[in-house]
């Protein structure tokens, strides 16, 4: 996807100042190296003090120009002062929402493409070496003979906002799918749970994955196949209603131990470039690889990065099975499953490849200068502003209801209703476009609209994303907000609306240049939970 490069004044002007200072120091060193030169006669100036004064004047001029350029960029033109009228802030209009959004985007939201590119390059190199080492190492010792064990496929797939050009703030977290290779004797039969009776809404987007015999031209008996794949079934499967099903819990346990062994293999070769540590995870949080580069081409790119390594089982057509999504509330008791189902046998589905195709399809049909990705970034920033003042439990619930995936789905739903981003999605209508996204999200929270999964929805975008596996084509539509109860959704909608109404005040208080903060900061809203209504 295209990336627009703009001049970053926060980097450019300090760089110019540092360069001028370096030139002065270099001149001083070169002048001092001629020690054998005779001192000038009394009353004769050597010229260096005059040069220092000139350089100081130049630096002062540069700083004044920098300040003037920023003011002219983010403030509307001020009326001319006539006579000897006193200079007062009343001569300036308060900046409008569009100016505040642009200022906040440039100072708090926008990522440097240069730093993001270097961060992604570091992640690709380190994860690539780790995955190749894991593939070469194999899976010794877990299963007798080793031929019926899982293994790394040898590649990895970069997913998430960092690779879809809508990540915000810092390029310090990434998501990577690590595909696993099944033994040749094992095939999978995935099945959606969307039509399962008496199933809680939180599980309707999950899948079961039963084992089955692959097609055999020799016509081997089923009993012979069951006997041959018994070591694999004992190590990675659980019984569900009389059949062996692949277990996400057991696969993740193997994946973490195999990652640890693979990291021990490549750690020595990585010591000269970076420090790498691995944090174990669980079903709610996959293992995380922490990378701190020791040396880079540019000092500005020495960022500590966290890479979530997600084990994935390929279903076909770029669709993967991954660990199921976390429960809607972290403190809520575990939801009961219907008789015969087991939580460790549940899988989620990852359609990142299809979503990337859908974004590319929209970009091809978008009008020149469309800002829909910028609107998505600002919608994420709006969510972060809305979390201010909440306690940790309420902030966690707010973040899960308005997750980045939900916000991306809101954007895709709004755009697909119109066919493509038209002329109304340009920079001049940024505030109106953002308001449209907020209103649609509020309506989804209040059940006026249903926020379906962009691929697993009714009709969906199958024509734009290409073919899908049979299990996904036959799956029931998935409502992304169905897991949350009505009370939590109403409170989130009220919080979202109040955040939007106070957005100019929040933008002045928390972002942009200090001279935009002409109003007092928002009152303290430290609450134990969501707001019950409008503030």
Curated annotation (Swiss-Prot):
Transmembrane regions listed in the UniProt entry: 44-64
Subcellular localization, as worded in the UniProt entry: Membrane
Extracellular-side segments: 39-43
Chief location category: membrane
All ranges on the Cytoplasmic side of the membrane: 65-535
Positions of modified residues (Phosphoserine): 139
Signal peptide from the UniProt entry: 1-38
UniProt keyword annotation of Disulfide bond present: no
Membrane topology of the entry: Single-pass type I membrane protein
Key words of the record: Membrane, Phosphoprotein, Signal, Transmembrane, Transmembrane helix
GO-annotated cellular components: membrane
Keyword flag Heme: no
Entry superkingdom: Eukaryota
SMART domains (alphabetical): Mab-21
Pfam families with a match to the protein in the record: Mab-21_C
Entry similarity comment: Belongs to the ITPRIP family.
Record protein name field: Inositol 1,4,5-trisphosphate receptor-interacting protein-like 2
Organism: Homo sapiens (Human)
């Amino acid at each position: 996807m295209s990336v627009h490069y703009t001049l970053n004044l926060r980097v450019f002007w300090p760089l110019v100042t540092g360069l001028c200072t370096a030139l002065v120091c270099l001149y001083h060193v070169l002048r001092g190296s001629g020690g054998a030169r005779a001192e000038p006669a009394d009353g004769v100036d050597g010229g260096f003090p005059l040069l220092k004064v000139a350089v100081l004047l130049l630096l002062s001029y540069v700083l004044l120009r920098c300040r003037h350029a920023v003011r002219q960029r983010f403030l509307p033109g001020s009326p001319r002062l006539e006579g000897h009228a006193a200079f007062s802030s009343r001569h300036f209009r308060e900046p409008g929402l569009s100016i505040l959004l642009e200022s906040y985007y440039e100072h708090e939201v926008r990522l440097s493409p240069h730093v993001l590119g270097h961060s992604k390059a570091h992640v690709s190199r380190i994860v690539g070496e780790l995955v190749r080492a894991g593939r070469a190492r194999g899976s010794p010792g877990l299963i007798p003979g080793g031929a019926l064990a899982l293994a790394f496929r040898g590649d990895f797939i970069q997913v998430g906002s960092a690779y879809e050009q809508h990540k915000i703030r810092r390029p310090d977290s990434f998501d990577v799918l690590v595909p696993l290779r099944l033994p040749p004797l094992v095939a999978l039969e995935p099945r959606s749970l969307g039509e399962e009776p008496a199933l809680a809404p939180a599980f309707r987007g999950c899948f079961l994955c039963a084992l089955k015999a692959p097609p055999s031209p020799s016509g081997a008996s089923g009993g012979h196949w069951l006997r041959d794949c018994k070591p694999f079934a004992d190590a990675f499967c659980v019984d569900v209603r009389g059949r062996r099903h692949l277990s996400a819990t057991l696969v993740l346990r193997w994946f973490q131990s195999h990652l640890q062994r693979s990291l021990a293999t490549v750690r020595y070769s990585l010591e000269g470039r970076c420090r790498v540590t691995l944090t174990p995870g669980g079903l709610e949080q996959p293992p995380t690889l922490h990378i701190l580069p020791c040396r880079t081409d540019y000092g500005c790119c020495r960022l500590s990065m966290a890479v979530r390594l997600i084990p994935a089982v390929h279903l076909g057509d770029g669709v993967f099975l991954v660990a199921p999504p976390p429960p809607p509330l972290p403190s809520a008791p575990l939801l009961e499953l219907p008789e015969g189902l087991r939580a460790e046998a549940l899988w989620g589905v990852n359609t990142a490849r299809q979503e990337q195709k859908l974004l590319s399809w929209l970009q091809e049909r978008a009008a020149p200068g469309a800002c829909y990705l910028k609107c998505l970034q600002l919608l994420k920033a709006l969510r972060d502003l809305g979390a201010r003042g909440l306690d940790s439990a309420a902030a966690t619930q707010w973040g899960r209801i308005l997750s980045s995936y939900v916000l991306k789905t809101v954007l895709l739903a709004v755009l697909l209703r119109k066919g493509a981003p038209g002329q109304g999605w340009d920079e001049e209508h940024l505030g109106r476009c953002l308001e449209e996204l907020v209103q649609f999200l509020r309506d989804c929270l209040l059940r006026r609209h249903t926020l379906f999964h962009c691929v697993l929805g009714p009709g969906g975008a199958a024509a734009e994303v290409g073919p899908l596996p049979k299990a996904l084509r036959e799956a029931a539509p998935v409502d992304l907000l169905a897991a949350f109860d009505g009370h939590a959704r109403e409170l989130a909608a009220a919080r979202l609306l109040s955040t939007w109404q106070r957005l100019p005040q929040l933008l002045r208080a928390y972002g942009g240049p200090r001279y935009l903060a002409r109003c007092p900061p928002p009152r303290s809203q430290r609450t134990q939970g969501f707001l019950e209504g409008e503030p």
